[in-house]
Amino acid sequence: QHWSTWLHDAVRKCAEYEMMVDIHDEYRPTGFSRTYPNLLTQEGIHGNEQVPNADHNTMLPFTRFTIGAGDYTPGYTRKDLQTTFAHRLALPVIYYSPAQFLFWNEKLTDEHKRPELDFWKNIPTVWQDTKFLLGEIGEYAVVARRSGTTWYVGGITNTNARCLQLDCSFLSSDKKYIATIYTDDVEVPGKIKITTRKITLKTKLSFMLQRS
């Protein structure tokens, strides 16, 4: 009670000085950001710092993220992470947070070795539309979010591999799209395969998600 009051006072003070806030550790959303939108996000989550597995990650969209934005402290190249690279790349779409920070664990000069990081550079953090397309708690989740006329779709599975079919009927009927698709490269473990294809709202895409 005491420290929650202290935090709320701090958020108010930061608002006076037009400073944004990202609260870490145990604090969870209370709706306070509705009054003070400078409170962009908060941790209050068992995130990448604790190195959770994919079973845990597929529970979060149905539990923690139903009450507000969450800073999952996403990592990407840490050697101890228990998920695939495509799983990690999908999280900023599935997990809502107006402030997204990628915890870098390699030299910045190695960035050219990871061309998929362009996805991280360009992904929005706020959205005009959100659709939960597929999911089962603790099993898998597929979320689509729109910024402007561009859609982003993220899909993850738990520690079991599975095939999922994406129905693209959420797309606009009067548009044709070019989809850039990021998947785990089954021929080169630890790498991301990037492909492009034309799609419309009538397209159905099948994906084989690797375990974790």
Regions found by a protein language model. Name each.
Residues 1-82:
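Aromatic- and carboxylate-enriched substrate-binding clefts and catalytic-loop regions
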Residues 19-25, 98-109, 117, 127-131, ...:
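Acidic/polar loop patches that form or flank catalytic/metal-binding clefts of enzymes
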Residues 72-111:
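Charge-patterned, long linear interaction tracts outside catalytic cores
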Residues 107-152, 185-191:
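Glycan-recognition and catalytic regions of carbohydrate-active enzymes
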Residues 137-173:
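Carbohydrate-binding surface patches
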Residues 170-184:
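Solvent-exposed beta-hairpin/edge-strand motifs
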Residues 196-212:
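C-terminal beta-strand-rich structural cap/linker in extracellular carbohydrate-active enzymes
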